[in-house]
Amino acid sequence: MLIYIHGFNSSPESYKVSLLKTFANKINMPDVLEVPALSFDPAIAMQQLLTLVHKYQTQQGMRPLCFIGSSLGGFYATWLAEKFDSRVVLINPAVKPYELFEDYLGYNRNIYTGQEYMLTMDHIDQLKKFKVDEITHPDRYLLMLQTGDEVLDYNQALEKYAAVPSIVEEGGGHGFTDFDRHMETVLAFCGVNCLKAYS
């Protein structure tokens, strides 16, 4: 099972999610991907994710679980990967989102859902609780970066995940331009046998 964790002010309707869903359907595995619609509130968002993981483990036992996190979702995915000893793909991940949130304090609106909400210092404090100081199993990570990220400094991720296998592309942007070129790489890393699925 793959759990995709979207970024701040994003949703399950994002571009990368649509590409992943299309590819999963193409290889006849539409149920391999879960994409929860997460709350803007970090504590609630993490509880949503933990509930989903617990549900999956209850239903599927110890079958492999892989997280795919984009931007803020990469920050959450890192914490979850360490907690559950899971594989994880990080796409232009936020390393210090609690610092970035300071620019968004106050009124915000989700461009996908239209939801309006207030971001407070309490939310920043919540985020800090999910900070991971040490990556214990770098081989379980795949880092994907584009140097043209206009939102995050990709060098922070290079430093944070220095020991992690990585794909670093020149140019691009925060949304990871031409992400569709990496579908098979991402799913294969997560343990999905694309060739078998095609047959």
Where are these regions (language model features)?
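Active-site signature of alpha/beta-hydrolase-fold catalytic machinery across serine-
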Residues: 79-83
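The alpha/beta-hydrolase serine catalytic core
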Residues: 87-199
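Gly/Ala-rich beta-loop-alpha elbow adjacent to hydrolase catalytic centers
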Residues: 68-77
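Short beta-strand immediately N-terminal to the catalytic nucleophile in serine-hydrolase-like folds
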Residues: 64-69, 89
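Short hydrophobic segments within beta-strands
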Residues: 4-8, 68, 144-146
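Active-site catalytic motif of lipid deacylating hydrolases and related acyltransferases
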Residues: 1-61
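Generic beta-sheet signal
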Residues: 2, 63-66, 141
